């Protein structure tokens, strides 16, 4: 809503490929669009509507902290699903109904395997730091998860680099994406 003027593509539901480093303001760029497009909907238990995949627990926490005030203001429930924390508590958050899930791939896959989460209602998927997920060996889980979300849904992928693995993701899962390059040092965004 606040940054709607800067987010025409993501708000319009276009697939987005963002090239940018951490801390270039992209969390709000994808997060506000996801929240704005999900606002007014209610998730059934275990069936989130929006998914943000990140490589690390630390990044999951940063994204959650950044988006929580905005999510509250539009009455959306966020669940954070990461390794190294109580899986029981995360399962109960999903059972209670969370519109948006911020997750690391391994733990999300564990919860799906346990029957605690389904992705077939997810219509907006964000991959943040996709190159880091590839470097950490998460590609098999990431593709398995992307294969479960709604095929006609919106996808936004952010990556500092576009190596072979990330390029494969872009080609396989993004449809006619609009490409943004973010240079945090200049604070400039170029659209191609």
Predicted regions, residues:
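Nucleotide phosphate-binding site architecture
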Residues: 17, 35, 39, 60, ...
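Residues at the beta-strand->loop junction immediately N-terminal to the Walker
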Residues: 17-21, 53-54, 159
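Walker A/P-loop
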Residues: 14-34
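Short alpha-helical elements of helix-turn-helix
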Residues: 4, 29-34, 136-139
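Conserved pre-motif I regulatory segment
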Residues: 1-19
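Conserved nucleic-acid-binding Ia/Ib motif block in the N-terminal RecA-like helicase ATPase lobe
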Residues: 43-113, 121-124, 167-171, 179-182
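Short glycine-rich anion-binding loops that position phosphate/pyrophosphate groups of nucleotides
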Residues: 23, 106-108, 131-132
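Interdomain coupling/hinge region of P-loop NTPase helicase/AAA+ cores
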Residues: 51, 70, 79, 90, ...
């Amino acid at each position: 809503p606040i940054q709607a003027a800067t987010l025409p593509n993501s708000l319009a539901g276009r697939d987005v490929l963002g090239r940018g480093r951490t801390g270039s303001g992209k969390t709000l760029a994808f997060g506000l669009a996801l929240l704005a497009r999900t606002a007014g909907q209610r998730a059934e238990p275990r069936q989130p509507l929006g998914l943000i995949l990140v490589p690390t627990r630390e990044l999951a926490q940063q994204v959650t902290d950044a988006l929580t005030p905005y999510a509250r203001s539009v009455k959306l429930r966020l669940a954070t699903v990461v390794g190294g924390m109580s899986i029981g508590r995360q399962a109960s958050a999903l059972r209670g109904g969370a519109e948006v899930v911020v997750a690391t791939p391994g733990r999300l896959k564990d919860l799906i395997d346990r029957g605690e989460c389904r992705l077939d209602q997810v219509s907006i998927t964000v991959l943040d730091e996709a190159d880091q997920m590839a470097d950490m060996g998460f590609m098999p889980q990431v593709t398995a998860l992307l294969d479960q979300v709604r095929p006609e849904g919106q996808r936004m992928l952010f990556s500092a680099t576009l190596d072979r693995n990330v390029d494969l993701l872009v080609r396989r899962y993004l449809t006619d994406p609009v490409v943004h390059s973010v240079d945090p040092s200049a604070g400039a965004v170029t659209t191609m």
